[in-house]
């Protein structure tokens, strides 16, 4: 018995020594293992490399540190710059009036020689595959529209309008004229819509299919229609009555397959274009030259 107790007491110091060595090994971190000469940091960089004098951050277990390191790895490139975001929307391409009468049809209403940026109202159309592309622009901060009518009068017309809302956006909406009022139609044939409000003008561009299923509120554009031109103010993104009592209209039906550049003088520039006015001027001139009897 005495011999067994002696052998046990000889093993105790050895066991204590092994236990202390194990505890010391558990307390050592991975970064400490590579801290000696020739060792490597947590990202594999040799201690002798450039930047060795910089302090290498230790990997803490807190959520904030983890989230920050995850962001660095997920959203930063190798050079440390953020990855590029989606490119911004392309700016609105300027309407090319030089193509009027050649590759697209145009209507200009306003001052003689005006263009898409100076006319009171401007519209262009052209065929692109199975669609018709329309471009509209008007001197207004509200809305600009074109109506497709079987006559020159408002009522029972298919209308496409570009509306400037309170958020600064220009939206393409579909309406159906009921008498003098425009009722919005949920079925909107417009596609590839874009619009802008600049220099107190509403300008937009969109495409619409040539052929559509038969419907009371939408017409087939492969047929010829009178075009009605209108524009006016908007309140909280809703259109109100147009600016002039009798909106201009095309003199004859319009075919989308025929490109013309048609100018229509506004009221301020058509005073002397009326035959009655011309006759009155001639009569007054003759009266002044001949004198009174």
Curated annotation (Swiss-Prot):
Spans annotated as Disordered: 30-61
Compartments where found:
Cell membrane; Synapse
Which UniProt key words apply to this protein? Cell membrane, Membrane, Signal, Synapse, Transmembrane, Transmembrane helix
Q: Where is the composition biased (Basic and acidic residues)?
A: 46-61
Query: Mind listing the GO molecular function terms for this protein?
Result: dynein intermediate chain binding; protein-containing complex binding
Q: Where is the signal peptide, in residue numbers?
A: 1-28
Q: Which PROSITE patterns match?
A: DOMON
Principal subcellular localization:
membrane
Transmembrane stretches in the record are 271-291
Coiled-coil spans are none
A single GO BP annotation from the record? regulation of glutamate receptor signaling pathway
Record carries keyword Transmembrane helix: yes
The answer to keyword Membrane applying to this record is yes
Q: Which positions fall inside the DOMON domain?
A: 119-234
Q: Which domain of life is it from?
A: Eukaryota
Q: Provide the free-text tissue specificity comment from this protein's UniProt record.
A: Expressed in the brain (at protein level).
An example of a Gene Ontology cellular component annotation for this protein is: endoplasmic reticulum membrane
Q: What's its job? A: Important modulator of glutamate signaling pathway.
Q: What is this protein called?
A: DOMON domain-containing protein FRRS1L
Task: Give the organism the record lists.
Answer: Rattus norvegicus
- Gene name as annotated: Frrs1l
């Amino acid at each position: 018995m005495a011999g067994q107790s002696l052998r046990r007491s000889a093993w105790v110091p050895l066991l204590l020594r092994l236990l202390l060595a194990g505890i010391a090994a558990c307390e050592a971190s991975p970064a400490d293992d590579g801290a000696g000469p020739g060792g490597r940091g947590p990202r594999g960089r040799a201690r002798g490399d450039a930047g060795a004098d910089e302090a290498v951050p230790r990997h803490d277990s807190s959520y904030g540190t983890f989230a920050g390191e995850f962001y660095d790895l997920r959203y930063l490139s190798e050079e440390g710059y953020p990855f590029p975001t989606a490119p911004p929307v392309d700016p609105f391409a300027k309407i090319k009036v030089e193509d009027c009468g050649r590759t697209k049809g145009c209507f200009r209403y306003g001052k003689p020689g005006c263009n898409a940026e100076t006319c009171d109202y401007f519209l262009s159309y052209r065929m692109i595959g199975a669609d018709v592309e329309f471009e509209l622009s008007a001197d207004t901060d509200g809305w600009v529209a074109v109506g497709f009518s079987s006559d020159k009068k408002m009522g029972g017309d298919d209308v496409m309008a570009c509306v400037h809302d309170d958020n600064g956006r220009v939206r393409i909406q579909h309406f159906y004229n009921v008498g003098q009022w425009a009722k919005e139609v949920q079925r909107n044939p417009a596609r590839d819509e874009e619009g802008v409000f600049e220099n107190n003008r509403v300008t937009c561009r969109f495409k619409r299919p040539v052929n559509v299923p038969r419907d009371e509120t939408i017409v087939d554009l492969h047929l010829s229609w009178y075009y009605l031109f209108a524009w006016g103010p908007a309140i909280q993104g809703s259109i109100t009555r147009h600016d002039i009592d009798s909106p201009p209209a095309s003199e004859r039906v319009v075919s989308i397959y025929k490109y013309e550049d048609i100018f229509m003088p506004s009221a301020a520039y058509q005073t002397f274009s009326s035959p009655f006015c011309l006759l009155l001027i001639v009569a007054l001139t003759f009266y002044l030259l001949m004198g009174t009897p």
